[in-house]
Amino acid sequence: MDNERRLVLLTGATGHVGFAVLVEALEAEYNVRVVLREISKADSILSSEPVKNALSSTAAPELSFVEVPDMTVPGAFDSAMQSVTYVVHCASPINRGKFRDFQTELIDPAVKGTTNILKAAHATPSVLRVVITSSNSAIVNHNILPAPGTCVSPSDRQPDYPLDVAMHDADEAYSAAKTSALNATDTFVSSANDLRFDVVSIMPTFVFGPKELAKSPGDIIDGSNVFGIGLVLIKQSWGSLRIEAVSCHIDDVAQAHVQALNHDEDVQFPFKAGTHRSCLLASSFRPDEVRDIVEREFPKESWQGEEAVFRGKGSYAWYHTDYDVSAAEKLLGRKLKGIVEQIRSSGLQVLRIA
């Protein structure tokens, strides 16, 4: 598909996934309008090497910024949506840090932000497709695992979480937020009149790989990387933590979002107004593989001795869920990158900035 320098509205560009999507979109020569809660954050994006490189050619795409302080406010995206052809909505709170109120800080931004994006797109005749960053947590309740032998499909759904469960802790609130946002998308698409665009949801599992805006190893593992390269960076015990050991590479996630903008007849998601389709990105691993990969891929001084960067030797209890990733692999035109490449690229960044 010739993108004809069509304009992409992108949210969440300061996050792990959103920034990678931004770089991928610029390299694919899309013009991008980035939504920021604070316009001052544009400086960190513009000063980053990947963005500077993407904008360095004489025929470089255009990168602009617009401030939307609160995406939960009705009409928040109305003016930002002007002249937009594609929307990529990556912005959503993650379950890290301290929260005073799970409802207002995790769930509302995810659900209201998504519905406000969809409403603004519906009111903008130029919009052809909305791509949304969802999650496997939107379709799998990790407290009630699928029966053995079950393969989870991107078309699967689960009901919204009961309020008492959603408010239990940050992990439950995050899963509740992703579930409700996905279900709200389904409801919007099925009930909207004369919908001129279609919707594609990208559902990553844990996202491992470089965080290009990170300034320190601590920044790199401030997020899902903590369960990957974090295993050899964190020295304390993981305690009784039990984790779904299923992940995907940031490169695959970013490329999936941008490839999903292609709506030609011969691609995975050809244009079909008024529909909502999805794909899952997932690759199973074992936590004990991480140290093996590090010791095989990196110099001995980086993982052995008191001055070594990769001194962590702990692990956590784990389990696997089987996911159908065929739609994602068809979208990308190849197999997904596995744990070796995920840890190798994460480790290279750690060594580069440590």
From Swiss-Prot:
InterPro entries named in the record: Epimerase_deHydtase, NAD(P)-bd_dom_sf, NAD(P)_dehydrat-like
Name assigned to this protein: NAD-dependent epimerase/dehydratase ALT6
Presence of the UniProt keyword Oxidoreductase in the record: yes
PANTHER family: NAD DEPENDENT EPIMERASE/DEHYDRATASE (PTHR10366), STEROL-4-ALPHA-CARBOXYLATE 3-DEHYDROGENASE, DECARBOXYLATING (PTHR10366:SF564)
Function: NAD-dependent epimerase/dehydratase; part of the gene cluster that mediates the biosynthesis of the host-selective toxins (HSTs) AAL-toxins, sphinganine-analog mycotoxins responsible for Alternaria stem canker on tomato by the tomato pathotype. ALT1 also selectively transfers methyl groups at the first and the third cycle of chain elongation for AAL toxin.
Keywords: Oxidoreductase
Any one GO molecular function term: oxidoreductase activity, acting on the CH-OH group of donors, NAD or NADP as acceptor
Family label: Belongs to the NAD(P)-dependent epimerase/dehydratase family. Dihydroflavonol-4-reductase subfamily.
Enzyme Commission number(s) of this protein: 1.1.1.-
Pfam families: Epimerase (PF01370)
More about this protein: Gene clusters encoding host-selective toxins (HSTs) are localized on conditionally dispensable chromosomes (CDCs), also called supernumerary chromosomes, where they are present in multiple copies. The CDCs are not essential for saprophytic growth but controls host-selective pathogenicity.
Ranges in a coiled coil: none
Superkingdom of the source species: Eukaryota
UniProt-annotated binding residues for NADP(+): 41, 174
Pathway this chain belongs to: Mycotoxin biosynthesis
